[in-house]
Amino acid sequence: MALSIHDKKIIVSKINKISNTALSAVTADLQGVCVNKINELRKSGREVGVKMSIVQNTLLSLAIKNTVFECLKKKLKGSTFIAYSMIHPGSGARLFKEFSKKNTQFKITGAAFEGKLLSILEINQLADMPTYKEAIIKLLLTWKMLIAGKLIYTLSAIKQKKETS
């Protein structure tokens, strides 16, 4: 059943609002992927703050017009599945990357971050970027190792000083 103009305007408005607040966007071709798997992907996306939708390319290109994701227009071909990362810039890319490993038909077609169209290498880097929590944990572990190293160095210096005295 075809959508009315009113329904199309609502879809464009909704996607445009999401586009204006999202940190990054990733598009994929889901041709040949089972609906149940897509629903599982959407469920896991909601848990990490990723908003996903399947939108007609014409409506999507209208929705992303005059946003930082306008550069994605070049990548809109076939059935487009778009994921907007709302909390962490790499969430959508990480989710799609993991999903494409398990489902070979699922192909990541493009991504945009800070108004720039990303290459496949940059999409992988965005997906591998640690979350805020992971970055803090790594920083604390580094500090812990540095403090432990300084303590060992200080204790060995005291030991050497006592041995020479």
UniProtKB/Swiss-Prot annotation:
Query: What's the superkingdom here?
Result: Bacteria
Keywords recorded for this protein, A-Z: Ribonucleoprotein, Ribosomal protein, RNA-binding, rRNA-binding
GO CC terms, sorted? large ribosomal subunit
Q: Name one GO molecular function term.
A: structural constituent of ribosome
Q: Does the keyword field hold RNA-binding? A: yes
Q: Name one GO biological process term.
A: translation
Please provide an example of a Pfam family that matches this protein in its UniProt record.
Ribosomal_L10
Which InterPro entries does this one have?
A: Ribosomal_uL10, Ribosomal_uL10-like_sf, Ribosomal_uL10_bac, Ribosomal_uL10_bac_type, Ribosomal_uL10_CS_bac
Query: What family is this protein classified in?
Result: Belongs to the universal ribosomal protein uL10 family.
Function as written in the Swiss-Prot or TrEMBL entry: Forms part of the ribosomal stalk, playing a central role in the interaction of the ribosome with GTP-bound translation factors.
How the protein assembles, per its UniProt entry? Part of the ribosomal stalk of the 50S ribosomal subunit. The N-terminus interacts with L11 and the large rRNA to form the base of the stalk. The C-terminus forms an elongated spine to which L12 dimers bind in a sequential fashion forming a multimeric L10(L12)X complex.
Q: What is the protein named?
A: Large ribosomal subunit protein uL10
